[in-house]
Amino acid sequence: MLLKNIKISNDYNIFMIIASRKPSLKDIYKIIKVSKFDEPADLIIEDASYIDIYTKRISSGNIAIASGRIAYIGDEMPLKNNDTRIIKNDFLIAPGYIEGHAHPFQIYNPVTFNEIMIRHGTSMVISDDLPIYIKMGLKNIKRFMRFMGRLPVKNFWSVRLDSQSMIDMEKFSYIKIKELLNDDYVLQAGEITGWPYIINMEKNMLKNIYNSQFLGKRIETHNPGASKNTLNRMAAAGITSDHEAITGEDVKTRLSLGYHVFLRYSSIRKDLKDELKYIIDEKLPLNRLMLTNDGSPYYNDYMGMDDLIKIAISTGLNPFDAYSMASLNPAVYYNIDGIYGGIAPGRLADMNFIRDLYNPEPVFLMLDGKIIDKEVKLDPPDWKGYGMLYKNRNIDINKINFNGSDETLFMRNQVIMDLNKYKMEDSMEIHLITKDLKRIVSSNIHGMGQFDALASSYNIEGSYIVIGSSHDLMKKALKEVIKNGGIVFNGNKNIRIELKILGIMSDKHSDDVRNITEEFRSTMRGSGYKFDDPVYSMLFLNSINLPYYRITSSGIVEVKTRKIIKKPVSLKI
């Protein structure tokens, strides 16, 4: 490989000049002049072999780049001078991958999540805004979106229209959501977890959906196990995509109703291979299918978009179709294929240099026409300046009483909970303290294992949850979590996961996050946790978009009916 005048950079500050990726008129003039061979290119990849995602073949030619965009592809040699950087190599070039459905706040934070994405060749991410919007407010989240827009990965957002919990719905008023939807960094509304609001024609939800359509934004729903009638009604309301197909038949139903479908492969959902086999056997069209990885920290490091492409190819999918599902298809879905999703003139110069068609893992990346190290470490923002640091709180923990309960929340899997009316053997106590520290909900839980204490501020509501068998250690762990945020585990091993950012995210780099969450996972499983991913289990304990029962700030709730089975009790702290 020859890289002339090329510096492989691990400094993302080189990208600050192209924060919005909107070319100036001067840039457009330059790009056209380079394409006409009237002006030298900034960079030329000579004799490149690249994946032509549009015609589904490997093509070759010289690629000229100017102002961060591809200006020319073809057999002729573009104009160059002493300042033109030259790349000659034997790698195959693939388009930058797109993660179209991301949750960048699962212990890692959005910046460290970007580090992980780069490692796997993903150069554009469309992320859920839910927890940071609820905790930061409108002004700060808009500022934070602009900071994220200055990172090498292109960061866009999907704006939630409901809270996914029994609280905070007042924050999703039409006026507030309208301002967010108008932002240039927002491409979509959703995911919509509160789909009954649509079916029941709740006014605020329908106004937000109407405005999303008016602004040309996509609208994504969350409908696992939904009937065809429900999916019909959601599509009639304007829904454009869903990520919760569980079987190949689910995929077919969604496609038949006009949906775009995200095919998911994550630590809690490994349906992708079976879905793809069905899709191939049924000869379903592929142009409305996209790949997504929705995993927890330890999982994301091992299963990125490059791995999903590899899985798709190994299942029997045409390799070019697999790459399209990770690049062109999501670009078309989000109406950005004029600037992204493939290697062609006018597109941003985001590319992965890979060894061959069957190995999508990047050896190195090009982002905005600049070669960078795929192990790049990104500088964090001023978390305090964005209002994102957890605010320390002190309480008299002895004023909290853990009263016993008869019923048991038992875990069918790592995210689905049912309810028994009696206390089950091998269950432990679980208590939720509301984030205002004014109420407590108490029950038992089965499936988490057996240990002394586990306290956490890491959940959808931002409330405080403590589980265990030792009241003294439970109070000690809870006091620490209320004071500093994070996860505290006391059992056969003591673990402390600091979550200094809003009480749900670590300020550590991605490697550190992976190591501590792997240790937590291993320790939980060694303590009898029955499933694979305790991080997800903790996150979703009070999330009302999952069956069948949840422990929430409003009490123990039957999800389907929203009926309060057990009410909270007042605290006097």
Curated annotation (Swiss-Prot):
<dbReference type="InterPro" id="IPR006680">
    <property type="entry name" value="Amidohydro-rel"/>
</dbReference>
<dbReference type="Pfam" id="PF01979">
    <property type="entry name" value="Amidohydro_1"/>
</dbReference>
<dbReference type="InterPro" id="IPR032466">
    <property type="entry name" value="Metal_Hydrolase"/>
</dbReference>
<keyword id="KW-0378">Hydrolase</keyword>
<dbReference type="InterPro" id="IPR011059">
    <property type="entry name" value="Metal-dep_hydrolase_composite"/>
</dbReference>
<comment type="similarity">
    <text>Belongs to the metallo-dependent hydrolases superfamily. Adenine deaminase family.</text>
</comment>
<dbReference type="Pfam" id="PF13382">
    <property type="entry name" value="Adenine_deam_C"/>
</dbReference>
<protein>
    <recommendedName>
        <fullName>Putative adenine deaminase PTO1085</fullName>
        <ecNumber>3.5.4.2</ecNumber>
    </recommendedName>
</protein>
<dbReference type="GO" id="GO:0000034">
    <property type="term" value="F:adenine deaminase activity"/>
</dbReference>
<dbReference type="InterPro" id="IPR026912">
    <property type="entry name" value="Adenine_deam_C"/>
</dbReference>
